[in-house]
Swiss-Prot record:
Gene: mafaa
A GO CC term attached to the entry: nucleus
Family classification: Belongs to the bZIP family. Maf subfamily.
Protein name (Swiss-Prot/TrEMBL): Transcription factor MafAa
Record field: compositional bias (Polar residues): 298-315
Disordered as annotated region, ranges: 52-108, 169-191, 290-315
SUPFAM superfamilies per record: A DNA-binding domain in eukaryotic transcription factors, Leucine zipper domain
Domain called bZIP: residue spans: 223-286
Keyword Transcription: yes
Region of interest: Interaction with DNA: 229-243
Amino acid sequence: MATDLAMSAELPNSPLAIEYVNDFDLMKFEIKKEPPEADRYCHRLPPGSLSSTPISTPCSSVPSSPSFCAPSPGSQPGQNLVNGVNNNNNNSGNGNNNTQGSSGKPQMEDLYWIPNYQHHISPEALNLTPEDAVEALIGNAHHHHHHHHHQPYEGFRGQQYVGEDLSAATNGHHHPVHHHHHHHGHHAHARLEDRFSDEQLVSMTVRELNRQLRGFSKEEVIRLKQKRRTLKNRGYAQSCRYKRVQQRHMLESEKCTLQSQVEQLKQDVARLIKERDLYKEKYEKLASRAFNGGGNTRDPSSGNHVKTTSTDFFM
């Protein structure tokens, strides 16, 4: 903070310098996609410059702040950037009242938003437009002015948060680094879990699931596929248990039916045995009666005749 105050005291209050800074329009610059090895050139300062802004490098999407000792090349159209910075600082509260003068001119500290830009953020991986980059820089500069330390900008999020509003970070809603990543990871996991129901995960084909999971991180995809595999194994186990129970019930019912049939057959056998015994007893009675009757009526003269009669009876 003492360094910032010393720099602001040494900087001139020249109207030409202020006008030169106000005339810068970042909307006409595009985000350049460069290899990551160009990061080592991001933090070099131009020799002889009073500004603490790093030199414009391929890894930066905005030009460097001009030196206040250089003359103004002329007026250029547009003052949108500094006006946005001033409006943002005026709406944020009374934190900047101690550093603003009574003359109504924009403070020099408000113009130093570029040094606060975090160069480790890679804009080409976020599909950001120049308007989003300007909003991010304005919000990040305001946050650093109040808290005096670097914190991540909430607007820079992963590919899976493209649909969310990037302007939420300009309202001062900042959190610590570990809370930031923890909450975002939890919300992403919850959103991915809630996107598919259990029935959809089980019934969906692998090709359709892979098509739906494009754009999500590898860990979340692996976690969701593990959940799908667990649900399918659980469903298969339940199906096997249901089939076993159903088969057991069917076998038990068939066993009961066969046992009843066996009992019926046993009863039939017992009844037939009883009938057989009755017929056998009747036969023995009739046989004994016929034998006794034939023996009493037989005489010597007609023995052959009686014998023939007995034989005819049995026939």
